[in-house]
Amino acid sequence: MSELKTVGLFAITALAEIVGCYLPYLWLREGKSIWLLVPSALSLVAFVWLLTLHPTAVGRVYAAYGGVYVTMAILWLWAVDGIRPTTWDILGTSVALLGMAIIMFAPRNT
């Protein structure tokens, strides 16, 4: 799988997890409808399924996925919560993505 496809798959996986966790938050903290749990459950099922599509050992996938999750969470902060990321948010995201790239794309024998 190409690097671009791998990163895209990580991004879609992270979005599914964030949506799956955000909807119950809206129900519990914001008083929204309990029916939000239905799309939340579907989103989390999609998240788990998407994890199975990643092209490498599961431990490596989880470790690398963390970097993309951090990035998606900061983008969510900006797009959904309306809070502009700080310089430190961007720096931390960059470090997390660098770690993801090293884990996923470093040359290895196995």
Swiss-Prot record:
Q: Where in the cell is it found?
A: Cell inner membrane
Q: How does it sit in the membrane?
A: Multi-pass membrane protein
For this UniProt record, give its keywords in alphabetical order, as a comma-separated list. Cell inner membrane, Cell membrane, Membrane, Transmembrane, Transmembrane helix
InterPro entries for the chain: UPF0060
Please verify whether the record's keywords include ATP-binding: no
GO-annotated cellular components: plasma membrane
Enumerate the transmembrane spans. Answer: 7-27, 33-53, 63-83, 87-107
What family is it from? Belongs to the UPF0060 family.
NCBIfam families, A to Z: PRK02237.1
The protein here is known as: UPF0060 membrane protein Pcryo_1341
Q: What is the lineage of its organism?
A: Bacteria, Pseudomonadati, Pseudomonadota, Gammaproteobacteria, Moraxellales
